């Protein structure tokens, strides 16, 4: 029976361990707060709670991590330098920054350890069920070797190319989008409060209108650089943002996301781009 180590037994780590057990793996688990790993072991004889990281990785075919950030990953892994056998697998599911991820993979590769970054778009329930999306990048041979095992952990395994840091970048792209949506919903709630409409009532709009369906089209418009003919003129979009800010102010509310977008459109209009599609206002200069 295959044994893996799992370092970090928070909500996602716990879900991943449950999935590993459902897939017939035995797990050696470690967590900085030992009680969490001990609770998992107490409910499942196939999980061993280990007091130290070194104990957890001993005899494991793969070492998986689900921690909080780059600093926590390095704090856990670096003491293992020189202790892991050549050819050991380290699979990091932590959301980390792009450059530190590239440096970490290079550092461990130089030590003879096969280190791969595989962040996820998976809630704890997805981790337990093996659904959602897992990203992976780096050496194609490593991807091919890991694919059967990682595919059992997720609904879709997405390979993003040979640069080891690409998965980290794409995870940040996705989380930026998700968090940006939350910011927009916050502004919708503030605008609703300003005009005397209950937030739940305002959000009922999205039972009929799904603005997310326009996201691929809008992204393509921005990246293509084709801003004519416009589907939504920048000057008209800026007018709508003005209406939103004015209504919010009348109701004693201040919008959070709208002012930043308004600033970008003001800059575009100042460049004489008011008749172009609004996508021109958010493009990256020189990109």
What kind of feature is each model-predicted range?
Residues 53-114:
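Rossmann-fold NAD(P) dinucleotide-binding segment
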Residues 4, 96-179:
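Rossmann-fold dinucleotide-binding core
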Residues 27, 49, 115-116, 157, ...:
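Hydrophobic beta-strand scaffold residues
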Residues 166-285:
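Helical "substrate-binding/catalytic lid" subdomain
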């Amino acid at each position: 029976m295959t044994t893996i180590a799992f370092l970090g037994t928070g909500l996602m780590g716990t879900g991943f361990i449950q999935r590993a057990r459902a897939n017939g793996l035995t797990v050696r688990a470690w967590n900085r707060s030992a009680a969490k790993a001990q609770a998992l072991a107490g409910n499942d004889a196939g999980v061993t709670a280990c007091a130290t990281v070194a104990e957890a990785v001993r005899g494991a075919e793969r070492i998986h991590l689900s921690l909080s950030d780059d600093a926590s990953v390095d704090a856990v892994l670096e003491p293992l330098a020189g202790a892991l056998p050549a050819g050991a697998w380290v699979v990091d599911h932590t959301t980390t920054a792009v450059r530190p991820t590239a440096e970490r993979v290079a550092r461990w590769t130089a030590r003879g350890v096969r280190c791969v970054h595989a962040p996820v778009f998976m809630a704890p329930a997805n981790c337990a069920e093996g659904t959602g999306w897992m990203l992976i990048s780096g050496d194609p041979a490593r991807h091919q070797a890991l694919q059967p095992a990682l595919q059992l952990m997720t609904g879709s395994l997405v390979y993003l190319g040979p640069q080891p840091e690409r998965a980290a970048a794409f995870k940040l792209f996705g989380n930026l989008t998700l968090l940006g949506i939350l910011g927009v919903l916050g502004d919708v709630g503030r605008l609703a409060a300003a005009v005397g409409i209950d937030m739940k009532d305002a959000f009922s709009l999205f039972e009929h209108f799904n603005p997310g369906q326009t996201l691929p089209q809008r992204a393509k418009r921005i990246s293509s650089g084709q801003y004519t003919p416009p589907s939504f003129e920048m000057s008209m979009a800026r007018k709508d943002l003005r209406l939103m800010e004015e209504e919010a102010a009348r109701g004693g509310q201040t919008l959070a996301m709208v002012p930043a977008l308004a600033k970008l459109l003001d800059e575009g209009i100042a460049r004489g781009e008011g008749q172009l599609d609004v996508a021109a206002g958010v493009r990256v200069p020189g990109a």
